[in-house]
Curated annotation (Swiss-Prot):
It comes from the Eukaryota. Its main location: cytoplasm. This is Piercer of microtubule wall 2 protein. Expressed in airway epithelial cells. GO terms for biological process: axoneme assembly; cilium movement; determination of left/right symmetry; flagellated sperm motility. InterPro entries: PIRC1/2 (IPR026507). The keyword Metal-binding does not apply. Residues 1-10 have a biased composition (Basic and acidic residues). Belongs to the PIERCE2 family. GO terms for cellular component: axonemal A tubule inner sheath; axonemal microtubule; sperm flagellum. Microtubule inner protein component of sperm flagellar doublet microtubules. Interacts with CFAP53, ODAD1 and ODAD3; the interactions link the outer dynein arms docking complex (ODA-DC) to the internal microtubule inner proteins (MIP) in cilium axoneme. Residues 1-29 are annotated as: Disordered.
């Protein structure tokens, strides 16, 4: 084999390389939400191990999975500490404020603690 033929073979693409490129699936074109931008066939996007059945990897959970597993005693709280209802019981006994809401406006009274902050409000 001459040097000229060797150069031609090394620069020409091999058949196996072109076959691999044609078999590759299209990638996710848009780098946004993979659920909406992935161009791969969803049927091929499954995960399966020897210990689990195949599952779709694009949609892992839905509302029917909530409460699927019963709680086990190891995860129960060890003690019960109820919250004090002092504020709620006071509102229940005395009623709401004048306009039936809580006072959430900032307090605009003059600050007398520190003379430099006295006229900042």
């Amino acid at each position: 084999m001459t040097d000229r033929n060797r150069d031609k073979k090394s620069t020409s693409p091999s058949n196996s390389d072109t076959e691999m490129k044609s078999e590759q699936l299209p990638p996710c074109v848009n780098p946004g939400n993979p659920v909406f931008s992935c161009m791969l066939d969803p049927k091929t996007l499954q995960t399966a191990t020897s210990l689990s059945k195949p599952q779709m990897i694009m949609y892992k959970t839905n509302s029917s999975h909530y409460g699927e597993f019963l709680p086990i005693p190891q995860f129960f709280p060890c003690n019960y500490t109820p919250k004090e209802q002092v504020f709620s019981s006071h509102i229940r006994a005395t009623g709401f404020y004048q306009n039936n809401t809580l006072n959430t406006a900032p307090d605009r009274t003059r600050t007398l603690d520190f003379p430099n902050i006295q006229h900042t409000l």
